[in-house]
């Protein structure tokens, strides 16, 4: 009886720990530059940052050595930045190198979100 109960509890805990796959759209941006896109209040008072800053981010900047090294993520349309896992950053780098797009780096990402990181299952540019 105890063994069955333990097995059921373990199975339930395993299922509860698995997060459902999420699909997110936004702008591909490196982690180093993502802080520029974060919305913040400046003197005036006025807001700076946000999607307009993320959309202005260029492929050229994202491929600079320091930006490459920092890794990549997606700046979402609700003004949040989700870091890619290491494999996702490698996928993003390969896409950026192969792309002719200079800006407007809109992407669709699917994967498992864990805190502020997304474990990338698929990544593609969208129009």
PLM regions: where:
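Bacterial N-terminal signal peptides
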Residues: 6-16
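N-terminal secretory signal peptides that target proteins for export/translocation
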Residues: 1-2
């Amino acid at each position: 009886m105890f063994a069955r109960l333990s097995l059921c509890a373990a199975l339930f805990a395993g299922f509860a720990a698995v997060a459902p796959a999420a699909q997110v759209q936004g702008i591909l941006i490196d982690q180093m530059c993502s802080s520029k896109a974060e919305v913040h209040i400046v003197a005036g008072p006025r807001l700076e940052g946000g999607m307009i800053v993320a959309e202005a981010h260029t492929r050229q900047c994202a491929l600079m050595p320091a930006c490459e090294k920092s890794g990549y993520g997606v700046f979402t349309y609700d003004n949040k930045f989700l870091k890619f896992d290491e494999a996702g950053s490698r996928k993003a780098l390969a896409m950026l190198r192969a792309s002719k797009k200079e800006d407007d780096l809109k992407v669709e990402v699917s994967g498992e979100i864990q805190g502020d990181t997304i474990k990338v299952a698929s990544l593609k540019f969208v129009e």
